[in-house]
Amino acid sequence: MHVYIAGGTGFIGKCLTKKLLEQGNRVTATGTRSNFPLKAHPRLSYVQADLTRKGRWQESLAEADAVVNLVGKTIFGRWTKAYKAQIRESRILTTHNIVESLESSRQGLLINASAVGFYGSQGDTILDEDAPPGSDFLGEVGMGWESAALEGEKKGIRVVCARFGIVLGEEGGAVNKMLAPFKFFIGGPLGNGEQWFSWIHIDDLCAAMIWVTEHQELKGPVNFCAPNPVRNKEMTKIIGRILGRPTFIPTPAFAIRMVMGELASALLSSQRCVPKKLVSADFQYTYPDIESAFREILKK
């Protein structure tokens, strides 16, 4: 199988590339860097490109059997008007350009990144793929992002909108930001700590994406998260126990809002997501609970 990974130089893209190559697949990865940050491999091609703009990179899509789109500006920044525009455009415009380039006669599958932020903050409500979208900024972006991807269905392409939980792994993602306070003995819950945290280990995420390529019944929105979401305060206790650090110093919600601005709404939001479709398709998790995930990441 030949897989085209848009955004292949990022945290998730590098992991997925490695796993696909290990299984004997061919990979074409794109990114904005001048060189791909992995060792040269005979079945790996790299295209440097800005996918928000049309260009020759679209021609290289023609040979792929499946396309994985991971492109998107990180949400971890000050949400100025300009930054929010970058968050939106990097996702929706890139997806539009990719879908426009797909050929129904060739590509059978588009896995397009989305996020559990699609649901907004819904408290203790259990959220499977049929749950409604949120009305906040990330919910709005998620709807636009997925709508752009689902245009591919008009070409007869199987489209999977991969609603990622927070991705945990040793080499990137949110882990370093999450662990930083614990290193200084000031780790604690965010706000009241009651908000639900939907997450997934990077290895399970990449395995699930490969699983999707092999299971035709999976289409439309799919929650890519572990089957056991956890409250922020429970996760904090688990991290503290693994690291041998105290966890009794909460960060007040007002302080988070003062420092982070509008981004605080995302950090304090509650999404109790369950991967109904992946579980129904018998996908097996290596790290179904957050303690096993953090013990692997921290080698404890």
Where are these predicted regions, by residue range?
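Conserved Rossmann-fold NAD(P)-dependent oxidoreductase catalytic core, especially the SDR/UDP-sugar
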Residues: 96-136
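NAD(P)H-binding glycine-rich loop region in Rossmannoid oxidoreductase-like domains
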Residues: 45-94
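Mid/C-terminal beta-alpha module of Rossmann-like enzyme folds, strongest
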Residues: 215-262, 295-300
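Glycine/proline-rich active-site loop of Rossmann-fold NAD(P)-dependent oxidoreductases
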Residues: 143, 155-157, 168-177, 212-222
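N-terminal Rossmann NAD(P)H-binding glycine-rich loop of SDR-like oxidoreductase domains
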Residues: 3-23
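Alpha-helical substrate-binding/gating segment
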Residues: 179-187, 195-229
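C-terminal amphipathic/interface module of NAD(P)-dependent oxidoreductases
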Residues: 265-300
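Conserved beta-loop-beta element that borders a ligand/cofactor-binding pocket
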Residues: 114, 147-170
